[in-house]
Amino acid sequence: MVGTNHLRERGNTSGKGWKVLRIMKNGNNIKFAALIATAAASSMALAGGNPFTGFSADVSTYNDGTSDWYVVDMYANFTSDDFAVLNVFNSDIGTNDGLGFNQNDLADAQGGSWKPSFSFDIAGVYDPMRDSYVTIGYGVGAAAALNQTALDPSFGTGLGANIPVGAGWFNLTPDNPQYASGGQLHIGHFAMNADRSGLETMSFAADIGFNLGPGTEVFFGDGSLEIAVPAPGALALLGLGGLAVRRRRA
């Protein structure tokens, strides 16, 4: 797993004071991004270091009784539970084979939706484990109807297997802040059929906005990950011990 992250204060969104390095391998949809600060650190960073420590992923397998699935759950990580995530934006998310992610939700007839509020658990019909969605901490399944995550216009229709480059999502009700728990907050769930030939990696890069709760100053960070997706032959090992590319929550 390869990852980078950094912090910046609101107001420094033009790129001034930051040197941007982005290496893209478009053919395989593998992307790396790094930003190097050349300006003075923010007062927040000086006071307590960088509170946003990057993105991380849990990789697991799931069997729905018929098929095996690879599941990647993405998290935003912080140094404490005092921070609430407002939005994730400017994303670049995909798989090396370009086929994207599985959908299994209320919008199946339209190709499936990235809205978590569509990810219901209806036996024999819809299963959130094999559905792909983005979220700002809220739950799905029995909690889907209460999920207040909304998609940015940059998401387009919000339908289909792939996320448009630059897409974002946000907490529609920031007065109901979604604070980190155990130093992290769930921001996305990505399902892929384990029988897919040629699937090797998933890449995730995005910016994130966060604060200390309603009415407080907004800060921004970003990070990127390249996540190895195990080969089909690894399913037996995964079933025995599991595979994680981050330390699991207590």
What does each of the following model-derived ranges do?
Residues K25-A33:
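Bacterial N-terminal signal peptides that target proteins for export
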Residues A34-L35, A45:
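Cleavable N-terminal signal peptides
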Residues A45-G65:
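Boundary/junction segments of secreted and surface-exposed precursor proteins
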Residues S60-T157:
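Low-complexity, serine/threonine/proline/glycine-rich extracellular segments that form mucin-like
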Residues F78-S80, I163, G168-G223:
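Ser/Thr/Pro-rich, low-complexity mucin-like regions
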Residues P230-R246:
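A short, hydrophobic C-terminal helix/tail in secreted or cell-surface proteins
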